[in-house]
């Protein structure tokens, strides 16, 4: 769940965080790694475009994964924060899971302000740890030029545009996420996809991600459909 803090709310949040930090004698969590990415989303179902930040951390907690409670992205200068709880963050299926979200953004869909952000992880006892990330200044027009053009012709997917490379984000006919598959060129045979993923024989949905060539910036368009 995304939050935008007005000044009184932001001040109250900082006060509560300060009160909680020393309150517990348990072992604090750790952030082992942080991954982030800024993406322009071309949502064809809703006919809207907006920017979104993906933020994921690889956590460690001596008291167990279940001890983790909240993950925050905080911009102190702009008095903005986003809060993810254990009931709202996305979690990978790995033995050592990542937690985070692909949907961090502003209500109007504009890019997040550039600058330094704190990534704060808190456990149920109030102990916390944090790292910082720096988001670049992102021009919306530059990202919009990256949106790929996609065409499904028969049993072939064709992609064109300004992206330096492309990926297929694959889902089954019911919309369940399957995998990410790099595109070696600008065409992808559906038969190759069906051979690799037989569960898609009844149909598939997909999105196409275009990388900008700049680290952690890109655009994604979809969903698109193929049916036998």
Regions found by a protein language model. Give the residues of each.
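Solvent-exposed loop/turn segments flanking beta-strands in beta-repeat/beta-sandwich domains
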Residues: 62-71, 160-174
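Low-complexity, Pro/Ser/Thr- and charge-rich linker/hinge segments at domain boundaries
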Residues: 135-156, 225-228
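Proline/serine/threonine-rich low-complexity linkers at boundaries of modular beta-sandwich domains
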Residues: 24-36, 129-139
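Sec-dependent bacterial lipoprotein signal peptides
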Residues: 1-24
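Aromatic sugar-binding surface patches on proteins
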Residues: 89-106, 184-195
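Short, aromatic- and glycine-rich surface loops/edge beta-strands on solvent-exposed regions
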Residues: 111-125, 199-215
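Contiguous beta-strand segments within globular domains
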Residues: 41-59, 149-163
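Edge beta-strands of extracellular beta-sandwich domains
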Residues: 128-136, 214-228
């Amino acid at each position: 769940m995304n939050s935008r803090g007005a000044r009184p709310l932001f001040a109250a949040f900082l006060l509560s965080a300060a009160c909680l930090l020393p309150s517990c004698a348990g072992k604090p969590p750790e952030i082992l790694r942080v991954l982030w990415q800024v993406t322009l989303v071309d949502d064809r179902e809703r006919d809207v475009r907006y920017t979104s930040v993906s933020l994921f951390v690889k956590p460690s907690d001596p008291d167990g994964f279940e001890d983790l409670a909240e993950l925050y992205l905080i911009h102190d200068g702009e008095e903005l924060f986003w809060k993810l709880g254990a009931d709202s963050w996305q979690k990978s299926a790995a033995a050592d899971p990542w937690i985070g979200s692909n949907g961090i953004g502003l209500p109007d869909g504009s890019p997040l302000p550039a600058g330094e952000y704190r990534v704060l992880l808190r456990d149920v006892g109030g102990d916390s740890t944090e790292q910082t990330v720096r988001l670049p200044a992102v021009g919306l027009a530059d990202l919009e030029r990256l949106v790929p053009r996609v065409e499904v012709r028969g049993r072939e997917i064709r992609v064109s545009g300004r992206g330096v490379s492309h990926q297929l984000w694959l889902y089954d006919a019911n919309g369940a996420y399957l995998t990410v598959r790099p595109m070696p060129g600008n065409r992808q045979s559906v038969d190759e996809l069906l051979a690799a993923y037989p569960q898609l024989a009844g149909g598939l949905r997909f999105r196409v991600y275009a990388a900008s060539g700049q680290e952690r910036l890109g655009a994604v368009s979809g969903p698109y459909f193929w049916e036998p």
